[in-house]
Structures are given as structure tokens and as C-alpha cells.
């Protein structure tokens, strides 16, 4: 995409995360600093556009909401746009349900994981073998309102399950370090259910699933890391696969609701690809959305 933007006459400044893990606050700071660095070395741009994928899309969202006077438009792709808590709840509920139906298969639990866990040999392969050996619980995990794993076929659904479990295994200790070891996932009052499965199937789940209660300071960290306000004052286009295996597509609808409540619906345009994957959106679709964003900013007419 960098080459395509350059050929279209745009200068590009970009930043990676300076640390591993859920470094959303640092990502926001570093990316925002780019504009000042660019101005000091090259000159003040006539227009500035934000582009980001996945966690980077959340960075873009935060900057668009927080500094609308410094950016003209934003393209947020496959992003954590419903907020950090929404993503944590998705992953945490997936792990909690997996542990209920497949006890003892994986190390640790929702809020505990051994250091230096092997994501392939300790998470992915044991989970895959457990599911393939007993597929009966899979729909109860996949179709729960709290998870709704992406996929139209069993292989896609299993892939989404494994992605969530590996994501959890690699990220939970980082998250706990950021909350000083305090629990940030809360299912203490969650009633597990599904729009596709009778409630009776979830009676044992609701009676016996492991419960966790988040602490107020951990909730405060979530709120600061980043929860969207919906106060979107510049044009934004979102692009997301409908069956995203890692960051659920419904993040976009959660953000739409926040934008609607803030009275900023005119500034948000949602687009999707009816396919399975994560961020592999393709250059043509990406550039089309970017070009449409530029046209929107220039003309004031929403595509």
C-alpha cells in the first residue's frame, strides 16, 4: 500500500509499536507524534489522513476522535473499534467456555497463564485435537451470544476458536502486567445463552463455568485503553471482513452505535468483504476505500 500511495502523490509517515503486547496508549502517542516530526522535517501537510489495521485501526480511531482538528480523514481496517473491553470479553468468554467443555486441555485459565507458553504445542494442537475428538460442544462455544465465532463452515469456526485461544495465551500475561496483576475480565454475572441454541443447553454452563470478577482499577485501565466515545468529527471509512477470525466484525456495529448516539453518523461509512480472514483485504479494495475517503474530504460529499 505504501508504494500505491506514493504513486498517487501522497507522502507517507508510519510508526510501529515500540513494545510488544497491547500497547494501545503508546501506539496512539507515537503515531500522533509523526505529524509533528513530518512537519519539522518536510513541511506542514495540506491534509493528513490516518490509516490503520487491527490494533492500528484502534489507534487511528482514537486519534480521529481526540484530535479532529489535526487530521482530515481516517481509514480503519479490520479494527478493534468496539473498544478494548469488547475484545477482552470476546477472548475471555471463548476461553472460559472452552475450559468448561474441555477441562484440563489447556494450561492456565482465563486470567492465568504460565510464562513462555508454546502457542503451537501447548495451545493450538491440544485444542484442535480435543475438538476433533469431541465436536459436540463446539456449537455451544461458537454460537454463544458472548462469542459468536466467525465462520460459515466447521473449519472456519475451528480456526476462529484456535485464533482466540492463542491470542489469549500470548496476551493475558501482558494484560495482567498492565493492570498490576488485577483481574480485568468479568463474567461474574454473565448469563450464557444463544440465539441459535435453546437456553436449556446452557444450564450446566451457567451453573458451573468458572467465574471471574474484575477489579475497579482494572476496569479503569480498560476504559483508558481505549474506549470509543463515538464523537467522530472527521470522515472515517471502515473496512472489515464479515468473518474475521481474530477481531469480530461486530466491532464495527458497536462503533456505529456509539457514533449514532453521539449524533455523528454523517461522518462514518462502513464497508465489508463477505469473506473469512483477518486484514487480508487486498490492495484494490484498500485503495478504493482510501481514494473514496480523499474524495469525500475534498468534496464534502459522502460516498
Tell where the protein language model's regions lie, with residue ranges.
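Short amphipathic alpha-helix adjacent to the substrate-entry channel of hydrolases
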Residues: 1-12
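Alpha/beta-hydrolase active-site loop
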Residues: 21-42, 291
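Primarily recognizes the serine-hydrolase "nucleophile elbow" in alpha/beta-hydrolase
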Residues: 46-105
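Accessory cap/linker subdomain of secreted extracellular hydrolases
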Residues: 80-227
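Short beta-strand/loop motif that positions the catalytic acidic residue
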Residues: 232, 237-240, 244
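Conserved alpha/beta-hydrolase "acid-adjacent" motif
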Residues: 245-251
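Histidine-bearing beta->alpha loop at or near hydrolase active sites
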Residues: 267-282, 294
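Catalytic active-site module of serine/aspartate enzymes centered on a nucleophile-bearing elbow/loop
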Residues: 285-303
